[in-house]
Amino acid sequence: ASGNDDKIAWYINDGSGSFSTQQIISTNADNAYAVYAIDIDDDGDNDVLSASANDNKIAWYINDGNSNFSSEQVISTTADGATSVYAIDLDGDGDNDVLSASYDDHKIAWYINNGSGSFSSQQIISTTANGAWSVYAIDLDGDGDNDILSASGFDHKIAWYINDGNGNFSAEQIIGTNAYGAKCVYAIDLDGDGDNDVLSASINDHKIAWYINNGDGNFSAEQIISTTAYTATSVYAIDLDGDGDNDVLSAS
């Protein structure tokens, strides 16, 4: 996703880590901000999602199975200043629903997938994520459904929203308010105890931090990993050194 040219694109991997030139999917995502790929229409291939800030749009692009993509299929144009998009099953019906974070209206929202890629109107989860930058979903309380995480920059907040298993969400549960200019949130098991801990990147304090999950969705104070990720914008974790634990990556 690239903002200055409004572009959603992909790059073909030949299987050995060599990539093609840019393959354009769309140039109609006005100030494209985020992209994600997952099967949306339950046909076994991975479709593409985008969030674009200037047109307040969440959209998807249908993969025909041979990596040919349709024109944009608009899910919503009411995510004002859309900054983040993610998809996962939220209501327990086996298909992937869509989540958005939008900066201008401080909103975390989701869109119910009927299983074939048709979506409901916007379902608001919260309008108190002030300057919402990032949204993610994973099981945080060990009950088998996917809860929601948000990072919001105006209030420096990392928060989560409890899923009851049917796509009904609690009010925000604050994890921390010390991520100054919170820009990105992610979750994965970091301490090897089987539950998903939370990571944040914050732009104003150049910080990468994590929050220890006790297993039922109660979190520690922030544990600082670094304050030298200058203007930190993104965080992710995966095993990089083959020792079986998840290491942390940052972009600044």
Placement of each model-derived feature along the sequence:
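Blade-edge motifs of beta-propeller repeat domains
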Residues: 12-30, 62-80, 112-130, 162-180, ...
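Low-complexity/repetitive intrinsically disordered segments
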Residues: 1-16, 230-232, 236-252
